[in-house]
UniProtKB/Swiss-Prot annotation:
UniProt organism field: Gallid herpesvirus 2 (strain Chicken/Md5/ATCC VR-987) (GaHV-2)
Subcellular location(s) per record: Virion; Host nucleus
Keyword S-adenosyl-L-methionine: no
GO CC annotation, single: viral capsid
Record protein name field: Capsid vertex component 1
Function: Capsid vertex-specific component that plays a role during viral DNA encapsidation, assuring correct genome cleavage and presumably stabilizing capsids that contain full-length viral genomes.
A Pfam family that the UniProt record links to this protein: Herpes_UL17
GO biological process: chromosome organization
Disulfide topology: none
Length: 729
């Protein structure tokens, strides 16, 4: 929850409304199941040192990247870092159960409640509070661990804005949670009545007065609070804000009328101080005041008792109202003595007012006050926990796993009730659906030009997806972002395969380009490798072509392609792109390693493929190799090349088994290397090498669409505000 509070604080202090566009904030929780399905290694998160540690839960601070990606155009915002919080287990319980110093106050069951990441994301809206449902929000989570060392990696999770904005809130489903917390608190006060401060006992009595006679309920109430059970068994109904507001207004009016009646009664029957001590009693006051008075005050108060005390619900001992012969309002037995050992009737008052405030006090405010005492102060997190909370379950379109959208009663973010100036935004999907239905088409792209212009006039935010030529992504498609990256992987892989095929056609003979001493006992192995070389190369090319995006995104080819594309854009006066993880210049090969901040002569990044069994890529990061002594290595004429040696850079520390061998040093690997110009080197065992040059031709706009997603365009700031409208790249 601390991540939600911090993000909302930044959001509240930011100028998040600029011109025709504005940003709202939505709080989400991504459970372990969804994180795992997105490719996040939870071991790195669960094994990390906790940022917070309490008697109830611990959490880890996570720096997460956030980027808004426009529908169809390929334009996107700069990456911004926001604070996320990962709770290893019991995430929803940590959200919904107040944190106090004594864990015995609330009984919880965390067995089915997994860990989760708490994060807040921006929603882009127009001036009429409408959003494009196909605009995406990218969440980038760091994934580096001991196996990758200085190489920084990450995983992306994509959400469409339609996924992040539910049609309503579910505060009505939170009633059972609050009722359970109230009952557990009352059970705690009754069990430890003799040990707790009088203030806590009095607050417990106030709370009990608000919710009625709960003794039987407390004894029958289960000691376990299971939020997962509540989520699984809710009514799946959304709130009706108009009805709720009307009921609240009616209740306020009724309470004010009752208060006026109480004031009138007090004036007609003021406190009397003439009663004998032998008939000491407490009547006509509220139950919570009576308990404190009965237990702790057997002395007569001074005669100048203020009428304010009566209005606060406390009848001082010795001051009794409505007592006299034949008076039907007497509430205590006439046999009650000054020790007050027996109370023969119940105290029935249930309303209370705290002076000097004229606002009626409700059960949640009483509960919050008690939590503040039990928790050494009222924290903002406990303020939110003690109020109503809405949890809406959603299904992530990519992973098909559940995540939660959270709204807090005391929040100004999406679904919050603190600000009536920010109603929930509405989706433009309705406008598009009506247009498609009227014209009998199944996709907005097939609408007539006249209808597209009309929609763009009504909603300018849809103008580019509908009318702009040469969009880089498919318009109005939830999978367009994934399609762009798959298209990039496919295109660059095909370029590599074509280049290698052309090189083999031009020069089918392979030469030993890396110097290794071959002994006589190696000759049988060399002969066998020679016989298998065509199959090895064919299998390697198939592995490159069929590689998944997850494998491709951690390899040498994508890193070299980024260097090539960034250098190309920068050469012709475009943006200066930087590596996302390290802030190194993107055109520097190997810039994802922290220490590579300048160009290193002879550096080539390699991927290692297995020669035994299925041919698969083995490395989880590019393997940097420096080729020494090569003269015109990439020349197409082999007789112009010289034999060279290769070494690891001094800053590279191998971790995986394959990383401990240089290219050609082991019979177990075929190594494919790339430099910043997309030159290719396939190294077989014993140093035999095939070289090729990739011809990568892509439109500049498409290159920049990919680079703006994979890289940064400015240095990381210390204070980052992703919720401020900005110019798109």
């Amino acid at each position: 929850m601390e991540a939600h509070i911090e993000s909302e604080t930044i959001y509240s202090l930011s100028n998040f409304d600029r011109g025709a566009m504005r940003h709202l904030l939505t709080h989400i929780i991504i459970p372990d199941e969804c994180l795992s399905a997105a490719g996040i290694d939870l071991t790195n998160l669960k094994d990390a040192s906790p940022r917070y540690t309490t008697s109830v839960y611990s959490s880890l601070s996570v720096s997460v990247g956030v980027q808004i990606r426009q529908n169809a155009t390929g334009l996107c915002s700069n990456w911004s870092n926001v604070y996320g919080e990962y709770v290893p287990s019991g995430a929803l319980h940590s959200l919904l159960v107040p944190q106090v110093t004594n864990p015995a106050v609330f009984s919880t069951s965390n067995q089915s409640d997994q860990g989760a990441l708490f994060i807040s994301l921006p929603i882009e809206c127009d001036s009429q509070n409408r959003f494009d449902p196909f605009t995406s929000v990218a969440l980038r989570i760091p994934c580096s661990d001991i196996r990758t060392g200085d190489y920084k990696s990450y995983k992306d999770i994509l959400f469409t804005q339609d996924e992040l904005v539910p049609i309503g809130t579910r505060y009505n489903n939170d009633t059972e949670r609050l009722q359970t917390l109230f009952l557990q608190f009352l059970q705690y006060t009754k069990k430890f009545e003799s040990e707790l401060p009088v203030t806590i006992i009095e607050l417990g009595a106030k709370l009990e007065a608000c919710i009625g006679n709960v003794d039987d309920v407390i004894h029958s109430q289960s000691k376990q609070f299971d939020i997962m059970h509540l989520l699984a068994n809710n009514k799946h109904e959304f709130d009706t804000p108009d009805i709720a507001a009307r009921i609240e207004a009616d209740n306020t009016e009724i309470v004010q009328l009752i208060k006026k009646a109480a004031e009138a009664i007090t004036k007609r029957a003021p406190v009397s101080g003439s009663l004998e001590k032998g008939s000491l009693g407490v009547v006509s006051g509220l139950k919570q005041g009576a308990i404190a008075c009965l237990k702790n005050n057997t002395d007569l108060p001074s005669k100048n008792t203020q009428q304010k005390a009566v209005m606060n619900g406390l009848e001082p001992a010795g001051k009794i109202r409505f007592v006299g012969d034949g008076n039907t309002n007497v509430r205590l037995s006439s046999a009650m003595n000054h020790q007050l050992k027996e109370i023969t009737t119940n105290f029935e008052d249930v309303l209370m007012f705290d002076s000097p405030s004229q606002k009626p006090v409700d059960s949640k405010e009483i509960f919050l006050t008690a939590i503040g005492i039990l928790g050494n102060g009222i924290t903002l997190a406990n303020l939110w926990r003690c109020g109503s909370i809405s949890i809406v379950t959603r299904v992530h379109s990519t992973t098909k796993s559940q995540f939660y959208i959270v709204a807090y009663e005391n929040s100004v973010a999406l679904g919050g009730r603190s600000s009536h100036l920010t109603p929930n935004p509405t989706s433009l999907n309705i406008l598009l659906s009506i247009a498609c239905q009227e014209e009998g088409v199944d996709h907005p792209c097939y609408l007539s030009q006249e209808r597209k212009i009309d929609i763009a006039r009504q909603a300018p935010i849809l103008s580019d997806p509908l009318l702009r030529e040469h969009n880089q992504l498919q318009a109005f498609s939830a999978g367009s972002e994934i399609d762009l990256m798959i298209d990039f992987k496919t295109h660059i892989s095909n370029c590599v395969i074509s280049a290698i095929g052309e090189a083999l056609r031009m020069e089918p003979n392979l030469y030993q380009m890396i110097s290794y001493h071959i002994h006589a006992y190696d000759l049988p192995f060399i002969t066998e490798i020679t016989n298998r070389t065509p199959n090895y190369i064919r299998a390697t090319l198939n592995a490159i072509s069929n590689s998944s995006w997850e494998k491709f995104s951690t390899g040498a080819l994508i890193s070299a392609a980024i260097s090539y594309m960034a250098g190309y854009i920068n050469k012709f006066g475009g943006k200066a792109y930087r590596r996302y993880t390290t802030e190194n210049a993107a055109e520097h090969l190997g810039g994802d390693y922290q220490l590579v901040n300048t160009k290193i002569p002879g550096l080539v990044l390699f991927d290692y493929y297995s020669t035994g069994g299925e041919c698969i890529k083995l490395n989880n990061r590019p393997v940097p190799i420096i080729l020494n002594g090569g003269v015109d290595l990439w020349n197409r004429q082999p007789y112009n090349r010289s034999v060279m040696t290769c070494t690891f850079p001094e800053w590279f520390v191998p971790h995986a088994t394959c990383e401990k061998f240089l290219p050609g040093e082991s019979y177990a690997y075929i190594c494919v290397g790339y430099d910043e110009h997309l030159h290719i080197a396939i190294v077989l065992p014993a140093g035999f090498m095939l070289t090729a040059h990739t011809e990568f031709n892509w439109p500049v706009a498409r290159i920049e669409a990919v680079l703006s997603r994979l890289c940064r365009t400015n240095k990381m700031q210390q204070v980052l505000r992703p919720y401020v409208s900005e110019v798109y790249m």
